[in-house]
Amino acid sequence: MKHTHAQLNLDSLKLGKAQKKKEDNLMKQLRSSMQLLRNCLFQNEECKMAALKAHLVPVLHSLWPWFLTDNSSMQIALHLLCVYTANYPTGCASLCWASGGQSSLPSARSSAGNSLMHSILKLASQLSNDNSPIQQVVFCLLSNLALSHDCKSIIQKSNFLQNFLSLSLPKGGHKNPSSVSTLWLKLLLNISFGEDGQQMMMKINGFLDQIVEMCEYKHKSSQHLALLILHNICFSPTNKPKILANDKAIAVLSACLESDSCAVQRIGAASLWALLHNYQKAKVTLKNPSIRRRIDEAYSLVKKTNTQPEDELHAYYLKCLENIVQLLD
């Protein structure tokens, strides 16, 4: 791949049809190399470490201008990065280094916006409502990277998440989200697994209202993702006052207790328990008669339900409701 990059740069200085054909052949060769490397890296940490030491990220970064002119090569490069970063935090962090991943020293971290991570965010911003194959892969890659503290920090500083607010949400009773919405929800869910991500999202003006609206989707998979994000942000002490001040958010969470879906019931109960935990002011909001009625009815119903002792999810739901009732009493 390094050799191909050098050849591409040398040959780009020449003109003519023969030169164009040679360039096409080099790009074809590059695509084959990336596909082969992707297969070698799949679920293989030893190979990923070897790729890190061989400076895979700086090589891809140097080839980035060529990828931008060729969608097929860009898609394969992004697929390669998806495989490389999956369950490999060191690999994720290497995308943030200004040197292109050749050093793990903090001084090499990128602050000037010249890392591969910045280039990926720029590409994703340009495609934010596109729903092309490249957009799907770039969001898949960002979902991997969002689990890394270093990458999350660059996402925050880049203001990339502001693009979430420009999503056009479907109107009307039977709401079905666009596939772009689902890509965003999967990314945001991964960001919400850490408290830094939970706070980062709540700093975006209008974020909570948008997520709450997406919790009302009829499409079960997307609704579930949105509810999980809302559930996760309830665990941050900094976020609790804002969530409790949002009547619609509390209405959505309490309505979960009346859902036909056991998974949705659990999300609602766990979220309400999280809001109450170590936060006295939450009691005032959750003692609202209509919310309290839903809690008491759900608790009464779950105590009557006969389940197997090994049903851990049911036991967790019961524990959530027991703690909510105890804290409110």
Regions found by a protein language model. Give the residues of each.
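Alpha-helical solenoid scaffolds in large eukaryotic transport, assembly, and signaling factors
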Residues: 1, 48-49
